[in-house]
């Protein structure tokens, strides 16, 4: 399978586990690099990476055939990590004060 084929399969079925696994395995360095940039390493980064792959699968319909699949994936990963980080900041800001302090 190629990245292009995996993205095409996800555009038809975002739940195609084989296609998600292929993209993750074939683009591990890019994905880990983007996640580390936004979330560092550890538990939060691991959770973010799982959500990131799900969101990339859901965005596969936005892929244009003339696009470079690697560039598309890197762009999606970056924008989705930015979105995830902003969601986490928003959630933490709206958490009750006592609970926010217990989460550090």
Residue ranges and their predicted role:
Residues 1-14:
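Short terminal alpha-helical segments
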Residues 4-5, 83, 91-104:
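Internal acidic/polar
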Residues 9-10, 34-35, 59:
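Short, flexible active-site loop motifs that bind/organize anionic cofactors or intermediates
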Residues 11-33:
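A short, charge-rich alpha-helical start-of-domain segment used by transcription regulators
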Residues 28, 46-57, 67-90, 94:
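Σ70-family region 2.3-2.4 aromatic/basic alpha-helix that recognizes the −10 promoter
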């Amino acid at each position: 399978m190629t990245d292009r084929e995996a993205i095409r399969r996800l555009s038809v079925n975002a739940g195609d586990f084989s296609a998600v696994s292929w993209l993750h395995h074939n683009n591990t360095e890019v994905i880990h690099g983007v996640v580390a940039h936004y979330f560092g390493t550890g538990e939060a980064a691991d959770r973010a990476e799982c959500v990131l792959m799900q969101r990339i699968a859901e965005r596969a319909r936005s892929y244009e055939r003339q696009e470079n699949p690697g560039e598309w994936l890197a762009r999606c990963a970056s924008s989705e990590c930015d979105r995830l980080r902003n969601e986490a900041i928003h959630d933490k800001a709206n958490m009750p004060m006592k609970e926010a302090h217990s989460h550090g």
